[in-house]
Amino acid sequence: MSFIAQLDQRFSPLWDRIRQHPFLLETRDGTISDEVFATWMRQDYLFVEAAIPFIAALLPKAPRAHWGSLAGVLQALEKELHLFEERAAEVGVELRGAPPSFTCHAYVQFLLSTAYARPYGEGFTVLYAAERAYHDSWKVVQEGIAPDSPWVPFVENWAGPEFAQYVAYLGGELDGMARETTPTERERMAELYRLTLLYEIAFWEMAHGAEGWPGVDQDMAGSTSGPAWNPDRARGPESAWADLARRIEEGGEA
């Protein structure tokens, strides 16, 4: 049994919680409130911005064979920011000005500390688990979302074939790396996999419950402006992951 298959079996209750989360089911069924979805958009926009330095921190540790794929991820994440900006403008949501929630902030710090302080294989495990969780989550939404829903572009981005190809590539690479590690190293990777799934569940919970920071009024919770990784609002017509998928298909690796 592959490393990922073992992890999926071991943590199947967490995968069930992710795929059955009310946020996803309500988005699929068209019953999610505009306010709840706007909360998710603002927080995930901050998360995608933070994912850029996460990937950048992995690059110096990565094997040469992964340089191209990680560079492609950086480009795709920038396009995802455009997607958020385009959708927010379409539905009248202001992305800027919302401080990170407690869960968003904690998840970002988990990403960055893993990338900077842990071996590459552990950071790559977190990358795979997070991307796989998003693919599986939006596949749930894809099963029943109305074609005219304003959230269809998010479904197309994360449930589409290009992103699926990227996630499959990450999975194959992770299984390959795991075969070259010790049992102790694999157990550390498994623990980070578990924590990533827990953070994914917590992120949906945060958005669905409009979570702030525990113990304080929200006007005390933080800054009124986030980082500006991507001020350009232009957006191309294709999936953010199309360029990377083409590189994987044409070269056998990204």
Predicted features by range, described:
Residues 190-219:
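Acidic, carboxylate-rich catalytic segments that either coordinate divalent cations
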Residues 8-32, 51, 169-180:
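Short alpha-helical hairpin
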Residues 163-194:
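Long amphipathic all-alpha helical oligomerization modules
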Residues 214-253:
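Intrinsically disordered, low-complexity terminal tails and inter-domain linkers enriched
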Residues 42, 65-165, 194, 198:
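Active-site-proximal alpha-helical scaffolds that flank and shape metal-associated catalytic sites
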Residues 52-55, 84, 138, 170:
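Non-transmembrane amphipathic alpha-helical segments
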Residues 12-17, 31-61, 125-135, 204:
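Alpha-helical bundle segments that constitute or directly flank the non-heme di-iron/ferroxidase center
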